[in-house]
């Protein structure tokens, strides 16, 4: 059993878990704009405003931070923040040079943006599960708030679909529309009679890229968040004994998932630039 902040209302463990895994919603109804409970039957046209707020906010923070560091960069002894930024930039640049075999000045900045942005969104998972939602409830009257954008499939799928659009765009740009069509219809079996089979296989392969990207990131972060929530349901001594080791291990997951998303994006775009 779990209790609310004022200890006057007891809720079940399933209620507690469901509450922490529910997004703050906004939707349009006949009466105007509605929020949360009123959006239960709104269907597809429901905005997860907490995911939007934190993902956009962290993106702006990333841009502002790197811009400020770039302005104050010195050729002398760099500070800790400048060292971190330089390490990120040089590391991603090296990965792009090793993995991307085409010529495109966009890929390295794109890879850096994806890595840092996804990392920052993942990093929100280390904030205690009750801290921000409880503060928002008490100060703003917000009943639901999920602060980890990458535990929302809408966010991870949106990122992956953006990568998918770039894959198709550069495939057509480099190979031409006829070359892209030929790639979908004449591989892996180079015979006109097998064009339908080739088209099905290649289309499934192409569509599987954004789906696998989004589900991998979402699944790992959602599972990690769920474990933190389950730990929060335990007695205080068990919370302390389990939350610290899990948080330390989860740091690896946070970094690794950001790296994998970036790395696969670079590889997919490299494949799109290969003109057979």
Curated annotation (Swiss-Prot):
It comes from the Bacteria. CDD domains: ATP-synt_Fo_a_6. The lineage of its organism: Bacteria, Pseudomonadati, Pseudomonadota, Gammaproteobacteria, Alteromonadales. Belongs to the ATPase A chain family. The keyword Protein transport does not apply. Coiled coil: none annotated. This is ATP synthase subunit a. Keywords: ATP synthesis, Cell inner membrane, Cell membrane, CF(0), Hydrogen ion transport, Ion transport, Membrane, Transmembrane, Transmembrane helix, Transport. The chain crosses the membrane at residues 47-67, 107-127, 152-172, 188-208, 226-246, 247-267.
